Structure formats: structure tokens, C-alpha cells
Amino acid sequence: MIEKMQGSRMDEQRCSFPPPLKTEEDYIPYPSVHEVLGREGPFPLILLPQFGGYWIEGTNHEITSIPETEPLQSPTTKVKLECNPTARIYRKHFLGKEHFNYYSLDAALGHLVFSLKYDVIGDQEHLRLLLRTKCRTYHDVIPISCLTEFPNVVQMAKLVCEDVNVDRFYPVLYPKASRLIVTFDEHVISNNFKFGVIYQKLGQTSEEELFSTNEESPAFVEFLEFLGQKVKLQDFKGFRGGLDVTHGQTGTESVYCNFRNKEIMFHVSTKLPYTEGDAQQLQRKRHIGNDIVAVVFQDENTPFVPDMIASNFLHAYVVVQAEGGGPDGPLYKVSVTARDDVPFFGPPLPDPAVFRKGPEFQEFLLTKLINAEYACYKAEKFAKLEERTRAALLETLYEELHIHSQSMMGLGGDEDKMENGSGGGGFFESFKRVIRSRSQSMDAMGLSNKKPNTVSTSHSGSFAPNNPDLAKAAGISLIVPGKSPTRKKSGPFGSRRSSAIGIENIQEVQEKRESPPAGQKTPDSGHVSQEPKSENSSTQSSPEMPTTKNRAETAAQRAEALKDFSRSSSSASSFASVVEETEGVDGEDTGLESVSSSGTPHKRDSFIYSTWLEDSVSTTSGGSSPGPSRSPHPDAGKLGDPACPEIKIQLEASEQHMPQLGC
């Protein structure tokens, strides 16, 4: 019983095996070329490979009567070149006209470049939209009357591509942006082409036989003259198509044609170098095998099979077979074959596909060849290469537009290099400047500490050194030991803030507080902050100096007011500065900067203007200038506190005798 139940359960779990893999013999729907040649003619111009993979156009070549060429009398209307339909839209509708360009970055679509233009077609208002992505270019014309409200740029982009998912687009402000954009749009348009020309004689069914032919029949020579003009390769100035025009290593002559301002160079198999003993004739195959489209000329009725030539590039063939005509010239039968992933391309072949020699047929044939190459670009192998190339070019365009737009607004440029550690030495150069400034400030500190009892009156009410040597030491101009600017970056990627690395040079000095001598009524040093004339001039403009007449009175009044405050402040001095770097200003001043008042009349004496400034450099988006404080910071005596650095600004003038004032 158990075995029976288990058996039924196993039957339920059984599944049918997949069919066995088919061998190549199971996929042979077409006869081989040798089988076809064993039959009676006439034979078709093209035979499909045994395993398929190609399509054929133009299989009817029965000549019941001489074909008329009326359908080809107007090649400008019936025969036209097929290229990327969006490649010339920008040049036609946007370039030189009022329009707007934007750029953005989408997480899925990648880099986006968007162009829009207000257009009036007839009596109706329209929006012409052109969106470039890494895969393709979207174009549409939207009537404004169909919109409930006028859309913003993001909504406009979604009108042409619903997959757009960005918060905003950024305007392009570069005056030469149109040149960059039109160059990108038209990179898919080529004015130079190279096609292979293979001569197939009767009974030739392999690659080796095709490339080993050296003789040219009169019909083939006539066809080459019809196809283009014979040119000497030595010192040839036109498009050479990879042929050697200097040393003659790829033959002495070839066939060249200029068709509708497009240069075409033909790689003719019989004119390329022939190598004795080389069955594959690599000198010939390396040119024709690297072409994308080739013409196969048949003298007589021998079918051509597309897989005769092993090549990863050849995707389409135009087979032409000469047919004896009459006094009006020869007739040509034409068939076209291409790989399955190559889309159909025009102009379509007539039925029957037979042409009489003439300018109309030349127009048709050259147009067919050019359109064949454009169509081959859409094949899977070339489409991947094209997508990678397009993505790289679009990224380059995006970066160019962004950099130039930022530069037009005074942003980016050298600032981006400095914050990324490149340009101007980066971090290491800044660090060396900081260390250099630190040593200078410490030297000044040592000199000031050596002579603590020699003081004189300063403009702010403190006492300045009367010794000339000390005055020189104190005359070191605005020592900037380190710099920590905070910049507000306004760009498409949000507020990227980057602060250059600076080191606060704070020297801790411990000194015993001693009472001043009996004759000295004030401490060693006193500091007070003075209200500047404007907010932004606290560290830039020189303070107003009193005249010599009332100098003593002013100093006496301020010294009395600072008496209590000076006792609580530290006698040690530290040199530090906070310098704010505004947007768009290149270069960093980390050296010594002096503010001299020697040019002011009646100011002959040397003064030291000492002030306490509160470090108000904001790391927020504002980044306002450091502002002065009316009263000293509560923790001013703590020299090791980096949040409240002491800023000592020294103004030096000509070194002359300084009057001593007593309180």
C-alpha cells in the first residue's frame, strides 16, 4: 500500500523533459550553393545561408521588356538619404533663434540636455521640445492650447519622455552652448563613407576565390567607371578611407566619388595589393572585411552567399549583375541582403529590380549604399557601440555646459580644483603656508614677551611699546596663521560646502599675574573692540585716527574706562585671524597683509590697534563676514579655546617718536 502511494506521488512529481537539442542538420531549410549550381539556371543573385540570419530584397529579375526609368526620373523626391531624423532638428529650428537650454542628471536616464522653444505654427502657439538622453533624442511639438496650465521645465521634459524623474533642470548660461549642442546632435551624421567592391567571377563560391582575382573584365571596368572616378592614391587630398596615400602600401589607384557633398572611397578588391602565396589575401581582406557595406559585382550568373566572407563588420551587401543590353547601354540586376537585425532601408527596389545604366541608377545605387550603412548602425553590435559613444559624448557635453555656466556666474573654476585637492598645491600647500605663518607668529610672541614693561598708548586706549625694537616686532602686519573659509556652493548638485583645511594658531602662554608698579596705573595690555563704520569693514578698512590735539584726552578717557576690564584679561597675546572667502574669488591670501595709516595727515606716530573680534564665521549657507563685538568675550582669557580666538590686528606706520601719555 505504501509503495503504491509513493509510486503515485512520484508520478505526480515527474515532468516532461525538454526536447533534445537540435543539430545543425535540423536547421537547414536552404540548399547550399553547390547544390544550386548543380541545377539548371538561371540562378538567383543571392542565396541565403544554410542557417539563415539574413533577409533579401529584390528577387524578381525577369525581363519581359526593357524596364522604364520613369520611377527614377525624379531622384530628389523618390530617392533620399535616410539619416537620424533628430540629428538636424536643433540646427533647423533652434540654432540662431530664441530658445532655452537646460541640463540635469537623472538616476535612470543619466545625463539630460533639454532644449525648448516657443514656436508659432500657423495661428497656433506651440512648444518645440528636444530632450537628449544617453539612449536617444526625443522630439515633439506640443500645442499650448492643449495644456491646462503653462508647464515648468520638468513638466515639459515629461511631455516628451515620461521616464524623466528629476527635481529640477539647470539653465545653460554659456553663450557658445549652441555650438556644443549642435556638434553633439550631428555627431551621427557622417560625410565620409567607405564601401567594399568585390568582383565575383563565374563559379567562385568561397572567400579565397573572391579575393584571389586580379583580372578585371570589361564589364567590371565599365561598372567601376560608372560608380566613380579612378584616382591616384599618391598624395591624394580627399577622403582616403584608410588607404595609404604616402607610401603606396595599399595600391596605386582606387575609385572615388563625391555624392551630395559626401565623399565615398571604394575598396576595390582587384586594386588592393595582391600577395603571392597568401590564400586568404589578408592585404585585401583587412580593408574590405572592415567595411560595413559592400558591393558585389557579378560578371555571370553565380549566386552570392552572405556568409562567404567571414567578417564581424560586414552587415549588408548590394549585389549587381550585368546583363547585356542594347544600343542604350547595359542593364543591371540588383538584389540586396543584410543581417536580420539590420532594419529595412530605402529606396525600395522596383519590381523587377532591373536598371538601365544612367545617372538615375547611379543616384539610386549610391543612396542605397549610404542608407545601408546608416541602417547597419542600428544592428545590435553597432548599436551597443553607438550607445556607449553617445553616452560618453553626452557626459562630456553635460560637463562642458555645467562648467561654463558656473564660470559665467562666478562659480566653479579654480575653486573646484582647490576643494578637490588639485591646483595650487591643494592641502599640502595650504598646510605649508599654515606652518610658515605659525612660526612667524611665535617669533613675534617671543619678542613681545621679552619686554613686558615697556608700553605706550595705542589708539584704543591700551599701551603700546615705546621701544623701537619692540615696535618693529609689533609692526608685523596681520599675521594670518591659518585660514578656514566657508564657501557657499550654488550648483546643480545642492549646497556642496567645502572648507579649506586651516589650523588655528593659538599659543598658550602661562604667566603669573603680578601687580603693576606703583607708578603704572594700568596693566600690561588692554583690549577693547571698537564699533566699525560698516559691517563689512571691520577687518578691512583702517579706523579713524584722532588728531594730535585731542589724542591725550581721548587716551586718558578710554584708559580709565578699560581699567577694570584690563585686569581680568590675560596678559598673553595670540595671533589668529579668520578670513572669509567670498564666492567666485580665486586665490587665497595666507601671507602677510599690512594695513598702514602712514598716508593719513597728522598721523606720524606709530600706533597699535588691538581689538577683540568674536569668531562669527558661519558654516551655514550664509557664510557672513566675521563681525565685531562690543564687549570682550567671556572666555577671552582662555587662549586654548579655538571657538573664541583672539584676533590681533596691528597697524603700522612710519617709525617715529611716540608721545607717552599718563593716566
Swiss-Prot record:
- For this entry, the protein name equals Rap1 GTPase-activating protein 1
GoLoco domain ranges (all copies): 1-17
Q: What is the predominant subcellular site recorded for this chain? A: Golgi
* InterPro entries, A to Z: GoLoco_motif, Rap/Ran-GAP_sf, Rap/Ran_GAP_dom, Rap1_Ran_GAP
Phosphoprotein as a keyword? yes
The annotated consequence of H267A reads: Abolishes GTPase activation
**Which compartments does it reside in?**
Golgi apparatus membrane
Q: What is the effect of changing R286A?
A: Reduces GTPase activation
Question: Which stretches are transmembrane?
Answer: none
Specify where the region named Disordered lies, as residue ranges. Answer: 1-23, 442-604, 616-645
Q: What is the effect of changing C257R?
A: In a breast cancer sample; somatic mutation
**What species is this protein from?**
Homo sapiens (Human)
Xref: PANTHER family: RAP GTPASE-ACTIVATING PROTEIN, RAP1 GTPASE-ACTIVATING PROTEIN 1
What's this chain's function? Answer: GTPase activator for the nuclear Ras-related regulatory protein RAP-1A (KREV-1), converting it to the putatively inactive GDP-bound state.
**Biased composition, class Low complexity, residue ranges:** 567-579, 616-630
Superkingdom in the source lineage: Eukaryota
Q: Which GO terms describe its biological process?
A: adaptive immune response; cell-cell adhesion; cellular response to glial cell derived neurotrophic factor; establishment of localization in cell; negative regulation of microvillus assembly; negative regulation of neuron differentiation; negative regulation of thyroid gland epithelial cell proliferation; phagocytosis
Instruction: Supply the SMART domains for this chain.
Output: GoLoco (SM00390)
* Keyword Ion transport (UniProt): no
